[in-house]
Amino acid sequence: MRCEMLRPLLLSALPLLAASTVSGQAPTPPAAQLEAMKRFDLWVGEWKGSGWLSRGGDGRHEFRIDEKVQRKLGGTVLLVEGRGTSRTDKGQEVATHESVTLLYYDDKAGRYHWNAHDLRGGTIDAEPKLVDGGFEWGFRVEERGVTVRFTIRFDEKRWHEVGETSADGKTWNKFLEMTLERQR
């Protein structure tokens, strides 16, 4: 019975689908989104570098990091893929960070979106803010009573990122720093 009810709807939509396919014209990305994403043109590419991470009293842990930033969907979305590794006490290289992020501009809301997913199953939806030479994004960790922010600055050759935490939004404590060089 359901199929019979859906049949008229599907049959009426079929000519629209066929017409858009036959016309041979590619869809045009919204101009406002394309313009907003131009801010990140220098960030697109493949990057390699190193950094450190501090986990409270556990000291600093050094790591290597590879990042790839690609334009997708006609340039309206950036796909950021990152993988960090470090060496164990026995010299074995292990993955310490792996993430996939979508960065895009919502022209209707007038803001950027940062949608990140990591190896451990974590997800973050944040609103990046433009700063001189890059952008900032962050989130609140209620159970620890802190705000976490990351500041990413980049040019044609270098990507520098700092991670910080704050309990009051005024005093910031650095827990991460990394510098990457463009590979291509």
Where are these regions (language model features)?
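Bacterial N-terminal signal peptides
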Residues: 8-19
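N-terminal secretory signal peptides that target proteins for export/translocation
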Residues: 1-6
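Hydrophobic small-molecule pocket/channel-lining residues, especially in calycin-type beta-barrels
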Residues: 24-184
